[in-house]
């Protein structure tokens, strides 16, 4: 790459659920633009994160995890991931190295369908094998690397720890080298294309999953109903509604004497204040909306389905 060449392009982050795509995006940017929880399928929308460096601008598209689950919403999430792949200049596949050891059918059931689809695309493919920091004996990963290279010889396989940033600078350098020569598309100080209202709703959803872990069913959504910024005042008033699928889920989110939702609101408010760099007054309500994951009109209102 010469000094006069500036590269810019779109990079689709694809992979099974919980592979570490959102963690890698946040680590690469040095800022949090995608929520991260231990729950599979935390990411529902295409999350765009922009890394601007003197020689390149990398526009990452974090996507929902590739999975085999049924249902209208899951179908929409898969469409989002595939659309990102089709529009990308570079495809970056994230795999969880730990699952190769723990799940005997990992390659056949989780990886092969994804990589076969990716291989049909005529663009550079990089496979980032994530969570290598979990292996004291790195030789245990060698069979995975050999199998991946044998099955998809055109893909470049790269070890990385998104959480600890091991190998991340080298991975970013490799990604940049695959981008087309082009000027930057966004200002160098812009980190994302996401509206702040969307990011605030995502923060609330993250705190929900972190507070309730596996207890809370997947059918939960957050919608911002009110957003007021008074001119001349360093204060934003936000009213957010948490939608759940059943009355029992509502009780779970509220908690005993409202303790759970109060804790969720407090933690979300802190992060939203950091995002907006303003004081925030956040109020949360919980509403039951049965069958919302199959309601296309409601999914559209949440930005999860095309008009």
UniProtKB/Swiss-Prot annotation:
Tell me, in a sentence or two, what this protein's role is.
An essential GTPase that binds both GDP and GTP, with rapid nucleotide exchange. Plays a role in 16S rRNA processing and 30S ribosomal subunit biogenesis and possibly also in cell cycle regulation and energy metabolism.
Looking at the record, which segments are called G1?
Answer: 15-22
Map out region (G2) in residue numbers.
41-45
UniProt keyword annotations, A-Z: Cell inner membrane, Cell membrane, Cytoplasm, GTP-binding, Membrane, Nucleotide-binding, Ribosome biogenesis, RNA-binding, rRNA-binding
Q: Which GO terms describe its molecular function?
A: GTP binding; GTPase activity; ribosomal small subunit binding; small ribosomal subunit rRNA binding
- NAD listed as a keyword: no
Q: Report residue spans for region: G3.
A: 62-65
Name the chain's protein: GTPase Era
> What quaternary arrangement does the UniProt entry report?
Monomer.
Species this chain originates from: Nitratidesulfovibrio vulgaris (strain DSM 19637 / Miyazaki F)
The cellular location(s) given in this protein's UniProt record come to: Cytoplasm; Cell inner membrane
| Gene3D superfamilies recorded | 3.30.300.20, P-loop containing nucleotide triphosphate hydrolases
What cellular component terms from Gene Ontology apply here? cytosol; plasma membrane
Positions binding GTP in this chain are 15-22, 62-66, 130-133
How does the protein associate with the membrane? Peripheral membrane protein
Residue ranges constituting the KH type-2 domain according to the UniProt record: 212-290
The record's Gene Ontology biological-process terms are: ribosomal small subunit assembly
Looking up PANTHER family in the UniProt record yields: GTPASE ERA (PTHR42698), GTPASE ERA, MITOCHONDRIAL (PTHR42698:SF1)
Q: Which family does it belong to?
A: Belongs to the TRAFAC class TrmE-Era-EngA-EngB-Septin-like GTPase superfamily. Era GTPase family.
- From the UniProt entry, list the residue stretches annotated as the region G5: 160-162
Q: Which residues form the Era-type G domain?
A: 7-181
């Amino acid at each position: 790459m010469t000094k006069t060449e500036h590269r810019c392009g779109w990079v689709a982050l694809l992979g099974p659920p919980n592979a570490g795509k959102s963690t890698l995006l946040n680590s690469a940017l040095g800022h949090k633009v995608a929520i991260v929880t231990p729950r599979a399928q935390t990411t529902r929308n295409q999350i765009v994160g922009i890394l601007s460096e003197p020689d390149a601008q990398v526009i990452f598209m974090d996507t929902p995890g590739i999975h085999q689950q049924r249902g209208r919403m899951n179908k929409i999430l898969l469409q989002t991931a595939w659309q990102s792949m089709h529009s990308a200049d570079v495809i970056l596949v994230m795999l969880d190295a730990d699952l190769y050891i723990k799940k005997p059918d990992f390659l056949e059931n989780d990886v092969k369908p994804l990589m076969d689809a990716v291989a049909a695309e005529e663009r550079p493919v990089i496979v980032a094998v994530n969570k290598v920091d979990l292996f004291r004996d790195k030789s245990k990963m060698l069979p995975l690397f050999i199998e991946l290279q044998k099955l998809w010889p055109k893909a470049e396989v790269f070890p990385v720890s998104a959480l600890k940033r091991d190998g991340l600078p080298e991975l970013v350098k490799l990604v940049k080298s695959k981008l087309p020569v082009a000027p930057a598309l966004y200002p160098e100080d812009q980190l994302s294309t996401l509206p702040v209202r969307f990011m605030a709703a995502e923060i609330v959803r993250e705190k929900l999953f972190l507070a309730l872990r596996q207890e809370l069913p997947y059918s939960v959504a957050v919608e911002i109903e009110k957003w007021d910024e008074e001119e001349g005042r360093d204060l934003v008033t936000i009213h957010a509604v948490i939608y759940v699928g059943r009355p029992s889920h509502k009780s779970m989110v509220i908690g005993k004497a409202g303790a759970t939702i109060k804790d969720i609101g407090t933690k979300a408010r802190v992060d939203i204040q950091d995002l907006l760099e303003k004081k925030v007054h956040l109020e949360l309500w919980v509403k039951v909306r049965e069958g919302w994951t199959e309601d296309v009109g409601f999914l559209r209102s949440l930005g999860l389905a095309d008009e």
